Curated annotation (Swiss-Prot):
Residues 1-17 have a biased composition (Basic residues). This is Large ribosomal subunit protein uL16. One of its GO terms (biological process) is translation. The keyword RNA-binding applies. Binds 23S rRNA and is also seen to make contacts with the A and possibly P site tRNAs. InterPro entries: Ribosomal_uL16, Ribosomal_uL16_bact-type, Ribosomal_uL16_CS, Ribosomal_uL16_dom, Ribosomal_uL16_sf.
């Protein structure tokens, strides 16, 4: 499970996920990438499921970079609990994803194999995303 080693505060406010990604919106090291088209939240289980789908499909031939990390605690009250009595405990760790954010990068394989693998990973995520290459990364969403 991906989560921070330590944080300054145990709990955070929910916040709002608006606008487009400015940071993490361009390829840094890989040739091919998975780019978010919609806004959403991704948790550590979804990141791990997508990573496993990628590595199993390319049979460890490619170099894969994970460009997202869940650093926001999400709290949830137990079932059948009355309102009040303070904020609940941390249930899971998530990351807010804005449109345009690069999620995974890949290098060292052909474009067809990378497209197949990143499409498998795409289906593990709770929002729409698309396959991009170095040439096509600056296209409008």
């Amino acid at each position: 499970m991906l989560m921070p080693k330590r944080t300054k505060f145990r709990k955070q406010m929910k916040g709002r996920n608006r606008g487009y990604a400015t940071r993490g919106a361009s390829l840094s090291t890989g040739e091919f990438a998975l780019k978010a088209v919609e806004a959403g939240r991704v948790n550590s289980r979804q990141i791990e499921a997508a990573r496993q789908a990628l590595t199993r499909h390319v049979k460890r031939q490619a170099k894969i970079w994970i460009r997202v990390f869940p650093d926001k605690p999400l709290t949830k009250k137990p079932l059948q609990t009355r309102m009040g009595k303070g904020k609940a405990g941390v249930e899971e760790w998530v990351m807010n994803i804005k449109p345009g954010r690069i999620l995974f990068e890949m290098a060292g394989v052909s474009e067809e194999l990378a497209r197949e693998a990143l499409t498998l990973a795409m289906h593990k995520l709770p929002f729409k995303s698309k396959f991009v290459t170095r040439e096509s990364e600056n296209e409008i969403y």
